[in-house]
Amino acid sequence: MRSAWRIVRAARANSAFTGEGARVYGGRWNSRGTAVVYVSEHESLAALELFVHMMPMPPTGRYLSFRLEWEDKLTEYFQKKNLPPHWNTEPPTFETMQIGDEWVRRGKSVALAVPGVLSTSEMNFLLNPRHSDFKKIKISEPIEYRFDPRLVNR
């Protein structure tokens, strides 16, 4: 079994698995117009990903954490050796966005494992909410997530 985490603002919990945010704004591994859900291998990486995307403002308000589980056979693994040059730069490159877009177009798996930029020894996953196997992903009831005050009171 594969597991992952997603942390979202409580106000967005109902739409946390639609892929709409990524579809509207794009991301490192998808361009605007392609709906995907970003999740992280560990809850700490999910928190760090959220934190870095909110900088320079610290996260405020209520957050919820979801644990996801799915069979590993539903995951395609993108090989690090195939990463384009500058895959981890900011802003994200067209080449990395095309990786996710092409994966969605092919439709071979519901999950794509990609290396984390913030921690290259860990993985993030793209989930395709429109894939027929999306219903095979078990999503936990949300639990409250609190950012440590040492991170947000700086």
Task: Give residue ranges: language-model regions.
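Active-site and NAD+-binding cores of ADP-ribose-processing enzymes
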Residues: 2-18, 31, 59-154
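Short glycine/proline-enriched, acidic/aromatic patches that form the donor-sugar handling elements
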Residues: 26
